């Protein structure tokens, strides 16, 4: 018998998950999905395909076997309070995708319910996400494998201990924004040199995809790949000297530490 999967919050990440599990790589029918969002219009497209839309968090819990909490961290206290009043909530499998919200926080608020914590990222929207997953001791093997299969439908999965979770936010979850910023910086630099046109950003994006694929599959370290591009006295050497002078690596390290610090602050609340 198919599990009913409920979503509380139907923003970009929830939409990406739903898109994955109902795609050709997934195994879930729209009829087995239950949705609630304060802004009900977010559910409309999924409802047209057969998903059930309900009017409260409690209704999601009552109608689902698996509950995906896809709300912002600041909305968690209200959502957990509503769910804690639902009879049988401790028997539901809870999946949380919020930054900084621990398994213990969710499970203890829901009378010991099994909880699996996931850090997805926005490239899930095109089936190329990276989802970092951990679980609680009360989540059994079947539950864990089910959740892993859900997220594999939208990309790759990394399994870690929860103690590493907040640090991984800076590595895979928030980090697409860093790459978007790098792409924007390259495009802005090109514009400053008088380059423009519809082909500029697609060319930069293809370059980033190609460079990342070469690094992943080429069997060389980042420094070794940099060396393959760099000729003594050449253009790349001059460009890299400026990046080092401007402390590019230090800026990234500082940004990642700030990201982790904020996740720790959210965990402490």
Map each language-model feature to its residues.
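Small-residue helix-packing motif on alpha-helices
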Residues: 33, 43, 60, 196-203, ...
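NAD(P)-dependent Rossmann-like dehydrogenase/reductase catalytic/cofactor-binding core
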Residues: 205, 209-269
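NAD(P)+-binding Rossmann beta1-loop-alpha1 motif at the extreme N-terminus of oxidoreductases
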Residues: 1-55, 59-62, 109, 191-193
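Internal alpha-helical scaffold of NAD(P)-dependent oxidoreductase catalytic cores
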Residues: 105, 109-114, 130-168, 178-217
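Short pre-catalytic strand/loop immediately N-terminal to key active-site residues, enriched for Gly-Thr
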Residues: 115, 165-170, 222-227
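Rossmann-like NAD(P)(H) cofactor-binding subdomain of soluble oxidoreductases
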Residues: 49, 57-133, 137
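Short acidic capping loops at alpha-helix termini that bridge into adjacent secondary structure
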Residues: 29-32, 90-92, 198-199
